[in-house]
Amino acid sequence: IHNKHFRFTITTNGVLLNDEIQEFVNKEMDNVVLSLDGRKEINDQMRPFRNGKGSYDLIVPKFQKLAESRNQEKYYIRGTFTRNNLDFSNDIMHFADLGFKQMSIEPVVGDESDPYAIREEDIPKIMEEYDKLAKMMIEREKEGKGFNFFHFMIDLNGGPCVAKRLSACGSGTEYLAVTPWG
């Protein structure tokens, strides 16, 4: 429409992902974001089911299958780091060890009173983790086990989207988000 190109992305926690949905996603979606907060203990702490059981063991095999079905392209494993996993480079390495090639991990956005909220005093540790991650990526690349980390691929000359930084989310400024309820 009017020389516009629309790209469709879906984000999933993987719980309801099955072969039929995977087929639809691979046919209709340009990109897929797979929400996995980190290593098993981190993910299960942040994403338990109502019965208290963690979701990691259910979703990881589904995510691996989907990533392979897309030839390790046009998807991202998207993690979230919190005060509970400021050592998030270990989560990225865990994703790589699971066979994923496209990764992202972002800081949690929450009220400062939340126990998992990142605090100003955590910033030096976070900066250290990004440096550590860069070194680990170089080593993995030398070993023939390279992977992409989304935030190291951003055009630094273009700068971050101001609206996204102000709202902590690109929804409504860069993209349209639709909840399960429409």
Give short role names for the model-derived ranges:
Residues 41-57, 64, 68-181:
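Radical SAM enzyme [4Fe-4S]-AdoMet core and its adjacent flexible, acidic
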Residues 1-42, 49-61, 79-90:
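Canonical radical SAM enzyme core domain
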